[in-house]
């Protein structure tokens, strides 16, 4: 019966309430990037906003009901009015045909009652109808009703007026009221509703600022779709005379203020389409609307609109080819934003959410010649012509020796790393091949493994590290890349030349030979990218010019000494599953240097077996652009999100002899991208990156906790944890994990012994790894209890078990220490928080508070910080340093933001000194404290805000996190850290349950063993067991008869004891141990998992508080005994801002107070500096702005200089006047 109780049948209303995402999309607020209107700039801007798509959808349903009425021929519609109150109640009203106020003959209900209060009621079920409306399924307005606290409707049609209200999520309603009104009064439909904001995870009766902007934009889109209708929001109409007016709002100026050409707009009966140019290339964006429905996920109409632009650009490309110009259409596309607003009959969407159009659209017939002429006029077109001519290209060609044949002697002297083919003669039986290897060790393998005959036609050239990404043809960067220059020179390539045949080159094939790991895939990709970007025709017309040489990644040796080679881990894992009972030894080849010369000779003996020919199609440059172009961030994010979500193994089919670019990108290059993200981005639960996790695991498994030299420790960690990325990077990570200065780690998992860096350079001033020592910190062992280790999931590398997939510390370490990382398409910047506050947050969640509530109280903090954290104007956090400003112009700086190094602060002050803002600096700072005296020019600062800004004493702290979730999925958090708290809470609590169960099992097994031992000892002492004359078998039978438990299938735990074990003292000890074990079992049974957690949190809190007190005391002790004193300037001294109110849960749950509080945002006081005539924006208007401190000082100096000049002039005039007055009386009268 218990199983049967799990099955439930819900009412349709309850189903909507329990599973709203099925009908209206997600009801969780998440960060989404979209266009919104910026009132200050007067145009659309692309911003990341906190959007609740479910709330947007229920408002949209009523808006679309109103807009659908436009197509109703029963009466002309003139307006749609939307009003949103401060209390969050929304009213949408429209005139027009109106809803018939009659009872349905079939259902005996009024039509408005059915339309707004009964699911699956609609007038749009006739699929033969030619009306272009948004409604289709009969859910629409009813979903809004169900997801609202209250919902009312007023309909006036043909002299009758209908009123009805619903509440309790459409479960209860008032009786419909129908009255007669003046038939001359206009028809109307008015819907008023109050959404259930708490159901959408929002504050009660409150629409956020971001959601107001999103709704404003949504209503604006509707106004653009129907410019003949007056559509207004809160009494303010959107006055679009045409679609072109709306499209102009998407035009944005360049960084220099220059405006792009006006958009290309075409309107027809089927809708409107606009191509909006931008002077700077960006991510391709398309915004589509169908019958008023915003299709957030695009669809067939967006694809068709892009195809219109693409085909027109191809026509432009053909026209320019006549002038020997080859245009890169893919890059030109990035200069355009596309709007497509369609009017469609019977459109079909992917779901009730209507986020994507799936039916074939009827597109406006855009005049192609007009569009082509428009494209040819674009000012940025010339910048994307694929030519590399010019002085710089000529210089590079000259440096590389391009365009002339070079002798082997010249090549040897100019390219020392090149081992050239021994003959220059051509032989049709052999393809002259240049092998490009990853590093010198791979070069040695190739060179030592090639036969004498192969060396006649095969050269070898090693590459060091990562190649330059030349996707955007940045020849200035290429000029500084010696490796690529030498590679091009070895091949005889010339920049700017179009190659039709590889026979024009010194080598007819480039064989790329790299390690079989993610970094090797990246190097292959960069080589392909370089040649496709600079010489696309060479690859298009010569399939296989670039070929990939593959070597085994795993070799298996069976008992019969036969071997199997596997070229991918996917292939090896598949073999393992089908040969589970086979005994074998596996050797992993992570690098080419692992292969012996004998193995290398085996590879090159049959080169064709190991070689795949790369085939490059004409349109493959689009995909390579998306991967390597720095501006295609959003594409890479989407690519990584899909790749990370895929749970299977992806790899190239090495049995095929050809490789396409899409296969290489999606099946091999993707491994580098995924590995790059795994290395750079932290795990949400333990806050660690793989290298940090390997270090922690390896150090914790060492016997004892003796200090070890960092350089030696890195070698040990590499060996035991299968680390493959160089010991230098490992040493840097070890050093960073031990740094404990303010702004380093709030919790340093390793102890620093030596110079591990300081606030002077934020840790970059550490000593070399061979001079410094470290060991595990005591806090690390508290955070990562040893009892957890048997319960964790571990990673297997090279056939051995290494570190856990992720740890589950007692606190979310990600929040304690923060995390910064730049991955492939994703980046993360999570600030640190006070560990005791994180502990308080966890305690609050244990007490029943929601993570969303708790996380709002967390404030970024660095242990030892002596400043304060404020709220910024946009809701962000601001770290503010502290200072004393004295009336004589002296400033004593005692703290700077923890994200700023003391050296960087000094450099900034030096710049101000060069502008005469600062007259003197005296730095008394140490490793972990700030103590700096400044003398400022009189009048340079007039308010405390100017002082903080000019002296760089404030830094904004933004939260932009991307982490790996507990299931390993890459998850962007944007500014919301609540998921981190929740994921950690769930995993840690689950671990305590498992640990409690395991410990109970161990204690009960121990008790059973002790009781069995007691039985045996008691029987022995009573003379019932004769050990002297017994055999091993008879003793085992005796133990079995006594009901003793077996341990490891034997009774050795009692039979192998010394004779002293059977003494009276031992018996007493055994009874005492049994009593203690029983007490431990009883105590553990009474201890809930959360209590186990609280006990360990108590232990951590005590230890950390002692650690923090010591750190702070050290900082205060290092300060000067006699700091500066004097009268403080009231105008320039920092104010003590009020603390923000603490947000507590309204749904119960006891809040645990936190130590760090954020101070309220207060607008800075107005500047008292004089205007110095700097014009605003470079345009007209002749305005002026308050100047910087440097400009004010310069202005004051100029004024003083001018005043001195005027004084001198006045003095000279006075002297002359006195002399003239003395001489005049003595002159003869006739002179006058």
Curated annotation (Swiss-Prot):
Occurrences of domain Toprim (ranges): 432-546
Subcellular location: Nucleus
Region annotated Disordered, chain positions: 1161-1184
Binding residues for ATP: 65, 94, 122-124, 135-142, 352-354
Assigned keywords, A-Z: ATP-binding, DNA-binding, Isomerase, Magnesium, Metal-binding, Nucleotide-binding, Nucleus, Topoisomerase
Chain positions of site Interaction with DNA: 466, 469, 636-637, 689, 729
Matching InterPro entries: DNA_Topoisomerase_II, HATPase_C_sf, Ribosomal_Su5_D2-typ_SF, Ribsml_uS5_D2-typ_fold_subgr, Topo_IIA, Topo_IIA-like_dom_sf, Topo_IIA_A/C_ab, Topo_IIA_A_a_sf
Example of a GO cellular component annotation carried by this entry: nucleus
Cystine connections: none
GO biological process, any: sister chromatid segregation
Tree of life domain: Eukaryota
Biased composition annotated in UniProt, kind: Gly residues: 1175-1184
Active site: 771
Family annotation (Pfam families): DNA_gyraseB, DNA_topoisoIV, Toprim, TOPRIM_C
Reactions catalysed, as given in the entry: ATP-dependent breakage, passage and rejoining of double-stranded DNA
Residue numbers marked as site, Transition state stabilizer: 770
Cofactor note: Binds two Mg(2+) per subunit. The magnesium ions form salt bridges with both the protein and the DNA. Can also accept other divalent metal cations, such as Mn(2+) or Ca(2+).
Residue intervals of the Topo IIA-type catalytic domain: 681-1097
Region described as Interaction with DNA: 952-961
Protein family (similarity comment): Belongs to the type II topoisomerase family.
Protein name: DNA topoisomerase 2
This protein's encoding gene: TOP2
């Amino acid at each position: 019966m218990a199983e049967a109780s799990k099955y439930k049948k819900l009412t349709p209303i309850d189903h909507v309430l329990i599973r709203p995402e099925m009908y209206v999309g997600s009801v969780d607020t998440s960060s989404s990037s979209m266009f919104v209107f910026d009132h200050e700039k007067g145009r659309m801007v692309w911003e990341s906003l906190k959007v609740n798509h479910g709330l947007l959808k229920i408002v949209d349903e009523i808006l679309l009901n109103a807009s659908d009425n436009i197509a109703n021929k029963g009466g002309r519609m003139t307006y749609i009015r939307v009003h949103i109150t401060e209390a969050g109640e929304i009213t949408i009203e429209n005139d027009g045909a109106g809803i018939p106020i009659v009872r349905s003959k079939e259902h005996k209900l009024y039509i408005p009652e059915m339309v707004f209060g009964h699911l699956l009621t609609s007038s749009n079920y006739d699929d033969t109808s030619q009306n272009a409306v948004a409604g289709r399924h009969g859910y629409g307005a009813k979903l809004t009703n169900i997801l609202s606290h209250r919902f009312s409707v007023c309909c006036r049609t043909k002299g009758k007026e209908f009123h009805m209200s619903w509440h309790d999520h459409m479960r209860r309603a008032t009786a419909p009221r129908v009255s007669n009104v003046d038939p001359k009064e206009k028809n109307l439909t008015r819907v008023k509703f109050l959404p259930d904001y708490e159901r959408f995870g929002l504050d009660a009766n409150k629409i956020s600022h971001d959601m107001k902007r999103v709704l404003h934009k949504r209503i604006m889109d509707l106004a653009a779709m129907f410019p003949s209708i007056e559509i207004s929001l809160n009494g303010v109409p959107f006055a679009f005379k045409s679609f072109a007016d709306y499209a102009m709002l998407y035009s944005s100026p360049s960084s220099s203020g220059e405006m792009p050409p006006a958009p290309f707009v075409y309107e027809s009966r089927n809708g409107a389409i606009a191509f909006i140019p931008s002077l700077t290339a960006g991510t391709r964006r398309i915004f589509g609307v169908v019958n008023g429905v915003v299709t957030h996920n695009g669809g067939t109409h967006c694809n068709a609109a892009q195809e219109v632009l693409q085909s027109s650009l191809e026509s432009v490309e053909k026209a320019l080819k006549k002038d020997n110009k080859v245009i890169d259409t893919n890059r030109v596309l990035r200069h355009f934003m596309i709007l497509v607003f369609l009017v469609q009959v019977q459109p079909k969407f992917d779901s009730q959410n209507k986020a994507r159009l799936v039916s074939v659209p009827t597109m406006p017939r855009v005049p192609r010649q007009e569009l082509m002429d428009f494209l040819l006029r674009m000012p940025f077109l010339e910048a994307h012509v694929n030519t590399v001519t010019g002085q710089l290209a000529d210089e590079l060609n000259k440096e590389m020796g391009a365009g002339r044949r070079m002798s082997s002697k010249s090549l040897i002297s100019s390219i020392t790393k090149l081992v050239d083919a021994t003959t220059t003669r051509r032989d049709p039986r052999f393809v002259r091949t240049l092998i490009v290897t990853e590093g010198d060790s791979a070069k040695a393998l190739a060179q030592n493994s090639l036969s004498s005959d192969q060396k006649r036609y095969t050269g070898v050239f090693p590459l060091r590290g990562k190649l330059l990404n030349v996707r955007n043809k940045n020849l200035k960067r290429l000029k500084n890349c010696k490796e690529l220059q030498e590679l091009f020179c070895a091949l005889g390539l010339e920049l700017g030349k179009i190659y039709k045949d590889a026979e024009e080159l010194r080598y007819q094939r480039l064989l790329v030979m790299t390690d079989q790991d993610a970094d090797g895939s990246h190097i292959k990709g960069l080589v392909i990218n370089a040649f496709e970007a600079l010489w696309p025709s060479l690859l298009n017309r010569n399939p296989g010019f670039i070929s990939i040489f593959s070597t085994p990644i795993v070799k298996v040796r069976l008992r019969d000494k036969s071997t199997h080679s596997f070229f991918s881990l996917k292939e090896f894992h598949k073999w393992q599953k089908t040969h589970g009972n086979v005994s074998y030894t596996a050797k992993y080849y992570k690098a080419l240097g692992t292969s012996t010369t004998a193995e290398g000779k085996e590879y090159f003996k049959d080169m064709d077996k190991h070689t795949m020919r790369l085939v490059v199609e004409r349109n493959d440059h689009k995909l390579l652009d998306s991967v390597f172009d720095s501006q295609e961030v959003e594409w890479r994010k989407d690519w990584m999100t899909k790749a990370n979500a895929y749970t299977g193994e992806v790899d190239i089919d090495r049995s095929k002899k050809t490789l396409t670019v899409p296969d290489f990108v999606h099946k091999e290059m993707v491994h580098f991208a995924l590995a790059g993200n795994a290395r750079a981005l932290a795990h949400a639960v333990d806050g660690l990156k793989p290298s940090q996790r390997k270090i922690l695991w390896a150090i914790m498994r060492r016997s004892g906790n003796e200090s070890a030299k960092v350089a030696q420790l890195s070698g040990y960690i590499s060996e035991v944890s299968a680390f493959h990325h160089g010991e230098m990077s490992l040493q840097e990570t070890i050093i960073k994990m031990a740094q404990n200065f303010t702004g380093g780690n709030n919790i340093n998992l390793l102890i620093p012994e030596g110079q591990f860096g300081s606030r002077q350079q934020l840790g970059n001033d550490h000593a070399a790894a061979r001079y410094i020592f470290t060991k595990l910190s005591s806090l690390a062992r508290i955070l990562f209890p040893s009892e957890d280790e048997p319960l964790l999931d571990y990673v297997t590398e090279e056939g051995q078990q290494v570190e856990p997939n992720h740890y589950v510390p007692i606190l979310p370490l990600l929040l304690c220490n923060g995390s910064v990382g730049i991955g492939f398409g994703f980046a993360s910047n999570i600030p640190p928080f006070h560990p005791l506050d994180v502990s308080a947050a966890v305690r609050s969640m244990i007490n029943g508070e929601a993570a969303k509530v708790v996380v709002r109280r967390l404030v970024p903090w660095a242990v030892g910080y002596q400043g304060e954290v404020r709220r910024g104007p946009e809701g962000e956090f601001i770290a503010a340093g502290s200072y004393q400003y004295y009336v004589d112009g002296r400033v004593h700086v005692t703290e700077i933001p923890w994200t700023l190094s003391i050296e960087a602060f000094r450099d900034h002050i030096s710049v101000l000194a060069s502008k005469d803002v600062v007259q003197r600096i005296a730095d008394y700072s140490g490793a972990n404290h700030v103590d700096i005296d400044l003398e400022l020019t009189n009048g340079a600062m007039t308010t405390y805000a100017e002082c903080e800004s000019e002296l760089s004493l404030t830094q904004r702290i933004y939260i932009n996190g991307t982490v790996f979730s507990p299931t390993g999925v890459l998850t962007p958090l944007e500014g919301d850290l609540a998921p981190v708290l929740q994921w950690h809470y769930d995993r840690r609590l689950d671990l305590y349950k498992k640990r409690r169960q395991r410990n109970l099992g161990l204690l009960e097994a121990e008790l059973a063993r002790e009781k069995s031992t007691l039985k045996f000892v008691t029987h022995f002492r009573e003379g019932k067991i004769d050990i002297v004359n017994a055999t091993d078998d008879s003793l085992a039978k005796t133990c079995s008869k006594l009901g003793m438990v077996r341990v490891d299938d034997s009774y050795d735990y009692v039979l192998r004891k010394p004779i002293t074990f059977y003494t009276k003292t031992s018996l007493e000890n055994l009874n005492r141990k049994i009593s203690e074990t029983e007490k431990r079992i009883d105590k553990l049974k009474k201890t809930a998992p959360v209590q186990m957690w609280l006990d360990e949190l108590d232990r951590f809190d005590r230890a950390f508080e002692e650690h923090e007190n010591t750190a702070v005391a050290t900082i205060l002790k290092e300060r000067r005994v006699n700091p500066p004193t004097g009268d403080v300037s009231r105008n320039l001294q920092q104010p003590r801002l009020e603390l923000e109110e603490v947000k507590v849960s309204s749904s119960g749950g006891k809040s645990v107070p936190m130590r760090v509080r954020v101070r309220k945002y207060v607008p800075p006081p107005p500047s008292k500096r004089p205007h110095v005539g700097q014009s605003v924006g470079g345009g007209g208007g002749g305005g002026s702005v308050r100047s910087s401190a440097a400009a004010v000082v310069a202005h004051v100096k100029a004024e003083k200089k001018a005043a001195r000049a005027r004084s001198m002039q006045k003095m000279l005039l006075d002297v002359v006047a006195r002399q003239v007055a003395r001489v005049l009386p003595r002159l003869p009268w006739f002179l006058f």
